[in-house]
């Protein structure tokens, strides 16, 4: 049985493994293709991946072997994502991406960390253009990001944003995702994602985050 104890991990159970396609690009961008330690080790022993980089200070042990936790792995066979239906889920995270952390009424942009779980409580709200009390639906064409001030002023009135919202395509969402921060577990990942996040100030390395 594999040992993933705190002594081996320096209290770091959250470290992820970046999964690359055979062409050395991430398998997906939304979300970024990362694996848990269990998934990466399982794929390794199934001979589906090769290890590109490791966490030198994180060791996983079993009675017969010891192995460093992979930081970056690559598929041995190319996975053609065009064979899959590229679905865009309607959820809070994707609304944040589509609207670029920007109030769609006053245009105020928030620079807060997109990974902050309280962002929709402290800074922005998801507003229904046509309020639900007046029959408005919860879908891509009726919800936008709003700052709290605009949301309070709007109340249950029907006020239209500067640009009417629409459902983004998968590739439109990827283009917008490039303009928002991305959190990574290891700076060795930068080499493989920098073609997507060309502004390196948007790349946040977990152990260096302040």
Name these PLM-found stretches.
Residues 87-124, 144-148:
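Short cysteine-rich loop/turn motifs with clustered Cys
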Residues 51-107, 179-184:
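Short, charged surface segments at domain edges that flank catalytic/cofactor-binding sites
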Residues 137, 141-210:
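A detector for short metal-coordination/catalytic motifs
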Residues 120, 130-143:
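Short linker/helix segments within small regulatory modules
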Residues 115-130, 157-165:
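Short cysteine/histidine-rich zinc-coordinating motifs and their immediately flanking basic loops
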Residues 32-63:
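N-terminal juxtadomain amphipathic helix
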Residues 1-44:
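General detector of N-terminal leader/presequence modules that precede the first folded domain
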């Amino acid at each position: 049985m594999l040992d993933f104890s705190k002594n081996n991990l320096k209290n770091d159970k959250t470290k992820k493994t970046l999964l690359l396609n055979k062409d050395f690009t991430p398998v997906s961008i939304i979300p970024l293709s990362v694996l848990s330690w269990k998934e990466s080790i399982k794929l390794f022993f199934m001979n589906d991946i090769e290890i590109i980089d490791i966490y030198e200070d994180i060791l996983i042990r079993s009675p017969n072997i010891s192995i460093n936790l992979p930081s970056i792995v690559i598929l041995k066979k190319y996975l053609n994502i065009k064979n899959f239906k590229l679905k865009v889920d309607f959820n809070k995270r994707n609304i944040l991406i589509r609207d670029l952390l920007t109030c769609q009424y006053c245009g105020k942009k928030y620079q807060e960390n997109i990974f902050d779980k309280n962002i929709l409580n402290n800074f922005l709200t998801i507003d229904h253009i046509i309020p639900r009390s007046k029959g408005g639906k919860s879908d891509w064409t009726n919800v936008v990001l709003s700052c709290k001030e605009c949301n309070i002023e709007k109340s249950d009135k029907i006020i239209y944003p500067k640009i009417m919202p629409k459902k983004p395509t998968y590739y439109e969402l990827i283009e917008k995702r490039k303009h928002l921060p991305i959190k990574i577990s290891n700076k060795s990942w930068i080499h493989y994602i920098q073609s997507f996040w060309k502004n390196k100030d948007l790349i946040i390395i977990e152990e260096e985050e302040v």
